[in-house]
């Protein structure tokens, strides 16, 4: 298929139109298009429609939210262009964006001008551990510890593809003021939400080990009703996950819900970077490395290892290496007369009425059975 690809940036609408015309000029091999000053998006989209009208074409607009930031009416402009120009001219329109909240609001939401015109949507998720491990030349231990930090986000993984010891990679990429990931959560939250400070407070409270709604509220000194909207947004953005025991029949109404930071890197950042930003600004990286020496493997990696084990279990079931057809995979916990019970890997096979229970431990030495 003939393809037009346009990457939007933070620039004026006139500059965007000029660059879009350049894309059309290069793709159609018509140098005159780059010399024309376009003032109407509809004219630009008409060029796409008129190019090889009998052939199927793909028009990809990447970072679509930036065009909306420049001109809030752009979704309406695009709706008109689709209905009047593109729809009946063999054009497949693909909108991409890294700002989840804006993609939902301006492309998927019921009140968006584009609502009802999509034929599919794909939310790209981080890579699963089994896929990452299969593609890397790392020992199992190295892969687990790297994944505990990157969470399978390809861009983050790029910065950990060296032969350096992991601690040196962390120092260079995360702890250095010039490191690519030093301020990553700041950038993400500032782009996605309007009042980052409240979301920071929620993430910090959860990262400090407060997983019940009541404890998060107590830590923030706010009523639970006040922080629930923040939690919902963080869940929608993929930063937080709400877990309930695997056996709960009505998860949405469960009183056993626990909240966790689901993004591995954000969890790492709030645990080891955020509390020591003052020291890191003074280039004192050793204080973080000393803090990591206390519990990085025993607690931080061990927690991530539980979700890794659930991923491995799902993959083994899929391949038929474990005779189990899971309907749901998660974990289980309860409080009884004998104390707290926690099961790291719990799965339900509704078809055969079976339950799978497993425990996973991440230690330096093999665990006795």
Predicted regions and their residues:
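Phosphate-binding site recognition
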Residues: 1-290
């Amino acid at each position: 298929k003939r393809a037009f690809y346009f990457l939007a940036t933070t620039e004026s609408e006139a500059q965007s139109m000029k660059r879009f015309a350049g894309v059309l000029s290069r793709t159609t091999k018509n140098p005159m298009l780059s010399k024309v000053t376009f003032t109407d998006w509809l004219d630009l989209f008409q060029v796409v429609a008129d190019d090889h009208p009998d052939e199927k074409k793909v028009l990809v607009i990447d970072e679509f939210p930036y065009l909306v930031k420049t001109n809030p009416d752009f979704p309406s402009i695009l709706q008109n262009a689709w209905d009047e120009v593109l729809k009946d001219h063999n054009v497949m329109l693909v909108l991409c964006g890294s700002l989840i909240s804006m993609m939902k609001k301006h492309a998927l939401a019921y009140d968006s001008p584009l609502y009802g015109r999509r034929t599919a949507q794909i939310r790209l998720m981080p890579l699963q551990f089994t896929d990452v491990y299969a593609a890397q030349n790392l020992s199992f231990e190295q892969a687990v510890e790297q994944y505990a930090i990157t969470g399978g986000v390809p861009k983050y993984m790029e910065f950990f593809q060296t032969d350096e010891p992991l601690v040196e990679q962390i120092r260079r990429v995360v702890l250095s003021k010039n490191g690519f990931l030093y301020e990553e959560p700041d950038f993400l939250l500032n782009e996605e939400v309007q009042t980052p400070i409240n979301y920071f407070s929620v993430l910090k409270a959860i990262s400090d080990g407060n997983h019940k709604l009541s404890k998060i509220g107590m830590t923030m000194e706010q009523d639970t009703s006040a922080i629930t909207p923040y939690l919902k947004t963080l869940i929608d953005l993929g930063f937080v996950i709400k877990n309930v025991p695997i056996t709960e029949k009505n998860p949405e109404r469960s009183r056993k819900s626990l909240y966790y930071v689901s993004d591995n890197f954000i969890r790492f950042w709030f645990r080891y970077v955020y509390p020591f930003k003052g020291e890191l600004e003074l280039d004192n990286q050793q204080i973080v490395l000393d803090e990591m020496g206390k519990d990085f493997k025993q607690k931080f990696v061990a927690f991530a290892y539980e979700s890794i084990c659930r991923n491995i279990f799902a993959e083994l079931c899929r391949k038929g290496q474990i005779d189990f057809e899971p309907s749901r995979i998660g974990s289980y916990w309860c409080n009884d007369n004998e104390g707290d019970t926690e099961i790291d890997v719990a799965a339900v096979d509704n078809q055969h009425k079976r339950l799978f229970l497993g425990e996973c431990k991440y230690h330096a030495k093999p665990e006795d059975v």
